[in-house]
Amino acid sequence: MSSQSHPDGLSGRDQPVELLNPARVNHMPSTVDVATALPLQVAPSAVPMDLRLDHQFSLPVAEPALREQQLQQELLALKQKQQIQRQILIAEFQRQHEQLSRQHEAQLHEHIKQQQEMLAMKHQQELLEHQRKLERHRQEQELEKQHREQKLQQLKNKEKGKESAVASTEVKMKLQEFVLNKKKALAHRNLNHCISSDPRYWYGKTQHSSLDQSSPPQSGVSTSYNHPVLGMYDAKDDFPLRKTASEPNLKLRSRLKQKVAERRSSPLLRRKDGPVVTALKKRPLDVTDSACSSAPGSGPSSPNNSSGSVSAENGIAPAVPSIPAETSLAHRLVAREGSAAPLPLYTSPSLPNITLGLPATGPSAGTAGQQDAERLTLPALQQRLSLFPGTHLTPYLSTSPLERDGGAAHSPLLQHMVLLEQPPAQAPLVTGLGALPLHAQSLVGADRVSPSIHKLRQHRPLGRTQSAPLPQNAQALQHLVIQQQHQQFLEKHKQQFQQQQLQMNKIIPKPSEPARQPESHPEETEEELREHQALLDEPYLDRLPGQKEAHAQAGVQVKQEPIESDEEEAEPPREVEPGQRQPSEQELLFRQQALLLEQQRIHQLRNYQASMEAAGIPVSFGGHRPLSRAQSSPASATFPVSVQEPPTKPRFTTGLVYDTLMLKHQCTCGSSSSHPEHAGRIQSIWSRLQETGLRGKCECIRGRKATLEELQTVHSEAHTLLYGTNPLNRQKLDSKKLLGSLASVFVRLPCGGVGVDSDTIWNEVHSAGAARLAVGCVVELVFKVATGELKNGFAVVRPPGHHAEESTPMGFCYFNSVAVAAKLLQQRLSVSKILIVDWDVHHGNGTQQAFYSDPSVLYMSLHRYDDGNFFPGSGAPDEVGTGPGVGFNVNMAFTGGLDPPMGDAEYLAAFRTVVMPIASEFAPDVVLVSSGFDAVEGHPTPLGGYNLSARCFGYLTKQLMGLAGGRIVLALEGGHDLTAICDASEACVSALLGNELDPLPEKVLQQRPNANAVRSMEKVMEIHSKYWRCLQRTTSTAGRSLIEAQTCENEEAETVTAMASLSVGVKPAEKRPDEEPMEEEPPL
């Protein structure tokens, strides 16, 4: 049938009838199923019969229009009904909402009212409690007042026969106040060592007699005890006390005896039972210890030269002639063993103080064994000290009170302080120049100082500062003081050398170039001292040849010899005019003074080293490179300079560079757990190389700090000045050259430190020096390899550098070490082709930026890219360079995330198909490797996530060694798992030394790279095949394993060899000898 019927018997075109109202349909006649009544066979050509009943009972024509109108009316009625119901619901909701709001507001008012009532009740209770307390206090005061009045009344009304020796409450309070003031005065006198300059004191001293009960013992007068002038009494002054009749006179008599003994003017009339030590104990004030320059006899303004009689009549005992006025450190300690209030220990971490050696209050029982051990070590120290000529330390160390009463925690400190004291007679003095001090603060005792300089300046008493650390145990505190002494000695020695050089430049300036003062870096003190020690250790006359002739021909002739010239003849001697005689004599005097100064500095160095070794701490200034005198030095301006012996040539092997100064670059928070890039990285690598013996097989070279000019070959001037200077030398720079204040550049990190971002921490004191040192170490190593002094090299440096851009530090990096080294190779050695391979798991965006348009530097990076979703987001395969550098920037960017992570098979395949073919076609002169090891297994996902083995990097290094004649330098970049980076560094150094590497596992050799790696390699080869022809034949081998690729290469090599052995050319016919005639054929 052409039309399908619906289950209800209606055709498809009549379906709208179903929209009728069901009530209306009920009135319609029901349909009759007549399907069974139809004949079974219907002719095909017959018209289909319509069996609907509505055709049989057809309605009028106007019925559909009416039906439609009724339907619309019903719809409108329904809508109106729904609208009414909706309004009713909304009204009900608003009514309930208002009702609930009123209830809530009422509850709030009720709650607030209750709270206010509670607060009012509480306040009322507090007021009542306060009133009760006030009333109770008033009642107590009234009772106390009544009680006192009753007592006073009883005292007034007492009978004469009763005893009255009991002192009243007022008298007891006065006595207690007097005793406390006296104790405070005694303690204050022990600290100040200075006689009061109050005018009331001088007036009172002359008015009061020795029998006055109101005057305290005058062995030492305190500034806090003021003697009032008659008629001038204040509320704070102490009134003289009336002695009662019942007070015993024994105490008064003892005081009188003491005062009479102290006021005797002549020491011959002193009592036999008053020894000298007693006076010293009772009166710690000494002539040299006092800071006052006037005697009490004539007031504060008179000089300190009054006689003993004047002192006696003023109540101050003079110095005893049998005791030296200039007491030593140990003698002052012995004199103060009975002091009532010992001085507090001052342990400043920055400057050693002589008060460190003062004894403690007394030894404890727990330190008896330690004191015995210290007593046993004293004779050994005395024997070692006996080697010093002219020393006075033996009686100090053998003093029994010092051993007996010295505190256990401070006795080693005192021994160390005494050991460091060197007599002035040891250093040769130059007339008119004075001696150079050995330490920043003198530790020499008063009995060893010349009388002309024994007077001390006035000072305030020392006490513990709020920032000073608490006293530690003996060993830790001694070690701290020794470190501080060593650092101060180095600082002082450096300052002396700079002052001497400045003085020499002033005396004999060179007209061709101005004098230049070197930059001063606090962290370079020990480094510069090592450099200058070579200059100090050489004999002065050996460094200045021709000086003996100058001594012989002082004012007559000066022989001029050529500098570093063996072929040219020396100029003939010329006579010096009489007018030039005086300058020659001045130069001769200056040379003699300079000779003595340098000898004195050498002597001080040796004495210091010997004293530190005597204290049990060996001090060595390390090795140094031989220094030649610069042409701008004062000596070279006037004297001939001898040709220095050439330095020892390093072994032609692998070079290593490392410096402990780079360890100081750390966050100020002091914790390395929250900072992956920490000092333990390079320290662990250096220890591993030493433990395995690889360090001994290599040549360790000395690094240096890169100059600001070298850094500016890659970075901007503002960036270099901001991150390449410390606070000391930054003040000398022009503020206009800096981009802005440091506060706008650095941020506060969550750990409490400071940094550029959450990764790149900044230490204001040490970060600039460490970053410059890392660049300088890489530059030194690269130049030694490029010039052929070393075979290859590995730089153990930090902070890394391949993320540092021209003006932006990021990713732990401040200066791009490898990029600076490459730029300097181009500028100074004219190296035409440089290959930089970066196998850090992060893309080296800074290195790419530096050489993006340079065709002489081929930059190849193997890194995790993940379509730009991995830090730093750069390094896409289509970043090929710009301008003339197109094609010389190759990014082997791995995509696909960590499903699965890349491993040895993927990196070996990338080297085989992309890196080595392009590098071989480029044919570099030097190979530099940004050797980051964060792709080694063991790193978390944010820092790498790949699963390369450490030995794989050894094989990658071995492949790169086949380029550039083996001139390759690896510089440490990333890598934060200590075990991983130590294993990888060991493998790379072993490969550089040419050692046999551990074989790769068979599984790695047979493993094919995963699909993500194959797609990444094919994309790179597709992009760069237009620039490098070698990639056209390696595209098909990207998905093969290492064994399959080697087998295929061997087969191709055999095929090429076989084809080369076959030749289709015809060999030329051999010529017959001319003398051999051709045989004629016989005639037929």
Curated annotation (Swiss-Prot):
Bias kind Polar residues: ranges: 629-641
Enzyme Commission number(s) of this protein: 3.5.1.98
Official protein name in the record: Histone deacetylase 4
Cellular component annotations (GO), alphabetically ordered: chromatin; cytoplasm; cytosol; histone deacetylase complex; nuclear speck; nucleoplasm; nucleus; transcription repressor complex
Effect in UniProt of substituting residue 345 to A: No effect on interaction with ANKRA2
Domain characteristics, as noted in the entry: The nuclear export sequence mediates the shuttling between the nucleus and the cytoplasm. The PxLPxI/L motif mediates interaction with ankyrin repeats of ANKRA2.
Low complexity compositional bias, start-end: 290-312
One Pfam family linked to the record: HDAC4_Gln
Positions occupied by motif PxLPxI/L motif: 349-354
UniProt motif Nuclear export signal: location: 1051-1084
Composition bias type Basic and acidic residues, residue spans: 133-163, 259-274, 516-531
GO terms of biological process kind: B cell activation; B cell differentiation; cardiac muscle hypertrophy in response to stress; chromatin remodeling; epigenetic regulation of gene expression; inflammatory response; negative regulation of gene expression, epigenetic; negative regulation of glycolytic process
Residues holding Zn(2+): 667, 669, 675, 751
Start and end residues of each stretch annotated as Disordered: 133-166, 206-226, 240-315, 509-531, 548-585, 626-646, 1061-1084
Keywords: Chromatin regulator, Coiled coil, Cytoplasm, Disease variant, Epilepsy, Hydrolase, Intellectual disability, Isopeptide bond, Metal-binding, Nucleus, Phosphoprotein, Repressor, Transcription, Transcription regulation, Ubl conjugation, Zinc
Phenotype when changing residue 351 to A/G: Loss of interaction with ANKRA2
Variant or mutagenesis effect after changing residue 559 to R: Abolishes sumoylation and reduces the histone deacetylase activity
Alphabetized InterPro entries for the sequence: HDAC4/5/7/9, His_deacetylse, His_deacetylse_dom, His_deacetylse_dom_sf, Hist_deacetylase_Gln_rich_N, Ureohydrolase_dom_sf
Impact when changing residue 346 to A: No effect on interaction with ANKRA2
Residues annotated as the enzyme's active site: 803
Assembly and binders: Homodimer. Homodimerization via its N-terminal domain. Interacts with MEF2A. Interacts with MEF2C and MEF2D. Interacts with AHRR. Interacts with NR2C1. Interacts with HDAC7. Interacts with a 14-3-3 chaperone proteins in a phosphorylation dependent manner. Interacts with 14-3-3 protein YWHAB. Interacts with BTBD14B. Interacts with KDM5B. Interacts with MYOCD. Interacts with MORC2. Interacts (via PxLPxI/L motif) with ANKRA2 (via ankyrin repeats). Interacts with CUL7 (as part of the 3M complex); negatively regulated by ANKRA2. Interacts with EP300 in the presence of TFAP2C.
